[in-house]
């Protein structure tokens, strides 16, 4: 420690600032009031899980808690079925409209096969998550999800979720394929295909 630093550490007098540098509009108690309503710790403050106006707001909590992964009262298999159906249905469109065969007669079938292939890859990743020596990670309650599903975070629950995900994903892609193959969409399919064509 230098002599300059030692003089400050041994000094018992508080440091005085010139009044021209002092902001009188901020009082010492103002910062505590802002901390009380804006950000609170959920459980252990060392973990860093904080309740903010975004993650503990009504809209965010209602949206997250109504997703099939966190909704109360449904089995892990149905959670996987609903999640997989959404993934398969939503993956079909980009694979069909932006895939390498988008301008051919096989675009609709190629999109179906690509979406089912992507669902198979995601299912393999879910199987690998359940394969290591320990059970799946159990999520503790936090500011957004008060009651995470306990039956999902077991080996059997995760296996049920995975099988439901595979079935729902393939079914969602097939459902999207059937919708695109109807006669009602024949008039707008060329318009949609020409949006992403290069050249």
Curated annotation (Swiss-Prot):
Chief place where the protein resides: membrane
Keyword Translocase: no
Keywords noted in UniProt: Membrane, Photosynthesis, Photosystem I, Thylakoid, Transmembrane, Transmembrane helix
InterPro entries referenced in this protein's UniProt entry, alphabetically: PSI_PsaL, PSI_PsaL_sf, PSI_suXI
GO process annotations (BP): photosynthesis
Keyword Lipid metabolism part of the UniProt annotation: no
Subcellular location as annotated: Cellular thylakoid membrane
Similarity annotation: Belongs to the PsaL family.
Protein name in UniProt: Photosystem I reaction center subunit XI
Organism from which the protein derives: Prochlorococcus marinus (strain MIT 9515)
């Amino acid at each position: 420690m230098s002599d300059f630093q030692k003089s400050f550490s041994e000094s018992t007098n508080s440091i005085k600032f010139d009044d021209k540098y002092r902001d009188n509009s901020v009082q010492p108690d103002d910062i505590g009031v802002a901390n009380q309503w804006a950000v609170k710790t959920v459980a252990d403050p060392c973990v860093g899980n904080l309740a903010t106006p975004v993650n503990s707001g009504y809209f965010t909590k209602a949206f997250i808690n109504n997703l099939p992964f966190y909704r109360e009262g449904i089995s892990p298999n149905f959670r996987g079925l609903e999640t997989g159906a959404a993934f398969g249905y939503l993956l079909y469109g980009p694979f069909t409209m932006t895939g390498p065969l988008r301008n051919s007669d096989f675009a609709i079938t190629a999109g179906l096969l690509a979406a089912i292939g992507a669902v198979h890859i995601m299912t393999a990743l879910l199987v690998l998550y359940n394969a290591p020596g320990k059970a799946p990670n159990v999520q503790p309650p936090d500011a957004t999800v008060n009651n995470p599903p306990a039956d999902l975070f077991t080996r059997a629950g995760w296996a049920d979720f995975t099988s439901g995900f595979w079935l729902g994903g393939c079914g969602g892609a097939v459902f999207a394929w059937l919708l695109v193959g109807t006669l009602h969409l024949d008039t707008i399919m060329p318009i949609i295909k020409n949006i992403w064509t290069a050249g």
